[in-house]
Amino acid sequence: MQRLSPGEFKTLISKERKSHFITPFALVYKTFCDLGYDQKNSDYFLNNPSEYIIAMRKNCWKEFEPFEKEFTTRMLSYLIDEERIKDMSPYDAIRDFTMEYPTHIYDLALSNTQSRRSRAGKEFESILELLMMGAGIPVDVQGAIGKSFFQKNQIGKLVDLVMPGVVQYTSNKRNTMLISAKTTLRERWQEVPEEVNRTGIREMYLATLDDSFSEETINILYEANVVVVTTIENKNFKYKNNNRVLTFEDMLQSAMELSRKWNNVSYTDSEKEEIQRSILKQIEKYSDFPYVVNYYRNRLSALFD
């Protein structure tokens, strides 16, 4: 067997990872349907967003974990030289393997960690996206429309969701909601107020599952017109007396109130065309996911009623 160099193994990890794992959105969508959320009405999502988010996060991890174990086993098996170890005891074979491939093992573990972090963020965005859809709240998604379209309309790259949409944001910022999703804040929270100042965004909701951000961080974000949003459990346990921290329940009620303000708005022909293009692009992006397609088709029908 030809020995793989660390560089060759890294390349193989990257190649195999792309083909082995389903996309974060596909995993979230599968979990969403497996848990029966596709059968829930809008009242459930409006009244129980924290419960939904916690359950989805937990079950997405349960769904993902076997994929990662299988992937790790498969990647390590590429390094096994059966001829070399055939006369060794199990102990000696394991010892020889770890001494022979410490860099390879480290690189695989590091790749798994980095992939987990990246996927966790994308999964959280997708969980919020399906939450808004379930609640019947119109929303445009950067992941479906593209960063360039968001940035062209002076919406920063850190914004993941726009309610009710990008076109509405450009015509009346006051009655729209911008949401940025971050599972944890760490030091990256500083990017958010910088983005708000740079783009002239009026206000941004920062949705997070983090429960370790300080009062100082909350105040800095608040002064920059960034509203921290977390689960009702985090709020009650860590920030009960801080009115500058909202719950997902609060955010959805605000989103619903804002969305109603667009019910009787008369759009220009060019605005309608832009909204239609945006919706059709998202239908194309999610063509394999019936629940999502149905949501966007309903939005399209409402546009021309």
Swiss-Prot record:
Its EC number is 3.1.21.4. It comes from Shigella sonnei. GO terms for biological process: DNA restriction-modification system. This is Type II restriction enzyme SsoII. Keywords: Endonuclease, Hydrolase, Nuclease, Plasmid, Restriction system. It catalyses: Endonucleolytic cleavage of DNA to give specific double-stranded fragments with terminal 5'-phosphates. GO terms for molecular function: DNA binding; type II site-specific deoxyribonuclease activity. Signal peptide: none annotated. Gene3D superfamilies: 3.40.91.80. Pfam families: EcoRII-C (PF09019). The gene is ssoIIR.
